[in-house]
Amino acid sequence: MADELNKAALEEYKSSSVEDRGEEGEIVGESDDTASSLGKQITMKHPLEHSWTFWFDNPSGKSKQAAWGSSIRPIYTFSTAEDFWSVYNNIHHPSKLAVGADFHCFKNKIEPKWEDPVCANGGKWTMNFSRGKSDTCWLYTLLALIGEQFDYGDEICGAVINVRVRQEKIALWTRNAANETAQVSIGKQWKEFLDYNDTIGFIFHDDAKKLDRAAKNRYSV
């Protein structure tokens, strides 16, 4: 079950009006009066333990000839809870993304690529969802990340949502795949946070690079 912090944050989001949040994917403009009023109301922001960066891999920018990961671009880096919500409430959620899109949220200065030194010896847990059914679990995953809810939080690199024709996949990337104790703990906690009942598997990045889709799960929970 998602923890109380995640529930409270989700309820706050649900209770906000459409005017407060803006339409899906719309970047909401501000009048001078609105900006001034907000500046007076928000006197203190709540810093996160880590800064995080959203990355987007646009399907229209992908090419079979291009190197993997060459079309991934950083979108925004945030370091407070308020800045997270400001960005999250004004971007498309997974159900509204185009097929082929990949949206990432990684600790700042860690690129969502196998080649990144922090990710190089890591791996990933993956959850599968029917098309259009991952929005809430994606939000809960983000809240667990930025809220430092994992016991082995230092192992976390970030998360990615992959939108495909028949399904959506959320993957949680970690840095030290060989640390079975840490990886199993992360997998179990992630399932609890999202109230996810199906078995999930952990694949080493090294296996994925060598075997592609033939790579097998090293751990399962």
Swiss-Prot record:
The Acidic residues compositionally biased stretches are 21-33
Q: Which cysteines are joined by disulfide bonds?
A: 119-157
Q: What happens when the gene is disrupted?
A: Slightly impaired growth and fertility. Plants lacking both eIF4E1 and eIF4E2 display pleiotropic effect on plant development but are resistant specifically to several potyviruses including potato virus Y (PVY, strains N605, LYE72, LYE90 and LYE84), tobacco etch virus (TEV, strains HAT, CAA10 and S103), pepper mottle virus (PepMoV), Ecuadorian rocotto virus (ERV), pepper severe mosaic virus (PepSMV), pepper yellow mosaic virus (PepYMV), and potato virus V (PVV). Plants lacking eIFiso4E, eIF4E1 and eIF4E2 exhibit a semi-dwarf phenotype.
Q: Which SUPFAM superfamilies match?
A: eIF4e-like
Q: Which GO terms describe its molecular function?
A: RNA 7-methylguanosine cap binding; RNA binding; translation initiation factor activity
Q: Which PROSITE patterns match?
A: IF4E
- Post-translational modifications reported in the UniProt record: According to the redox status, the Cys-119-Cys-157 disulfide bridge may have a role in regulating protein function by affecting its ability to bind capped mRNA.
Which keywords does the record carry?
Cytoplasm, Disulfide bond, Host-virus interaction, Initiation factor, Nucleus, Plant defense, Protein biosynthesis, RNA-binding, Translation regulation
Q: A Pfam family name for this chain?
A: IF4E
Gene Ontology CC: one annotated term: cytoplasm
Q: Does the keyword DNA-binding apply?
A: no
| Source organism superkingdom | Eukaryota
- Residue sites binding mRNA per the record: 64-69, 96, 114-115, 164-169, 209-213
Question: Annotated region Disordered: where?
Answer: 1-36
Cite the residue spans of the region called EIF4G-binding.
46-49, 56-92, 140-149
Q: Could you tell me where this protein is found in the cell? A: Nucleus; Cytoplasm
Query: What is one GO biological process annotated to this record?
Result: regulation of translation
The function of this protein is: Component of the protein complex eIF4F, which is involved in the recognition of the mRNA cap, ATP-dependent unwinding of 5'-terminal secondary structure and recruitment of mRNA to the ribosome. Recognizes and binds the 7-methylguanosine-containing mRNA cap during an early step in the initiation of protein synthesis and facilitates ribosome binding by inducing the unwinding of the mRNAs secondary structures. Key component of recessive resistance to potyviruses. (Microbial infection) Susceptibility host factor required for viral infection (e.g. potato virus Y (PVY) and tobacco etch virus (TEV)) by recruiting viral RNAs to the host ribosomal complex via an interaction with viral genome-linked protein (VPg).
Q: How does it assemble?
A: EIF4F is a multi-subunit complex, the composition of which varies with external and internal environmental conditions. It is composed of at least EIF4A, EIF4E and EIF4G. EIF4E is also known to interact with other partners. In higher plants two isoforms of EIF4F have been identified, named isoform EIF4F and isoform EIF(iso)4F. Isoform EIF4F has subunits p220 and p26, whereas isoform EIF(iso)4F has subunits p82 and p28. (Microbial infection) Interacts with potyvirus viral genome-linked protein (VPg) in the nucleus; mostly potato virus Y (PVY-LYE84) and tobacco etch virus (TEV-HAT) VPg, but not with PVY-LYE90 and pepper mottle virus (PepMoV) VPg; these interactions are possible in susceptible hosts but impaired in resistant plants.
Q: Of which family is this protein a member?
A: Belongs to the eukaryotic initiation factor 4E family.
Record protein name field: Eukaryotic translation initiation factor 4E-2
Q: Which organism is it from?
A: Solanum lycopersicum
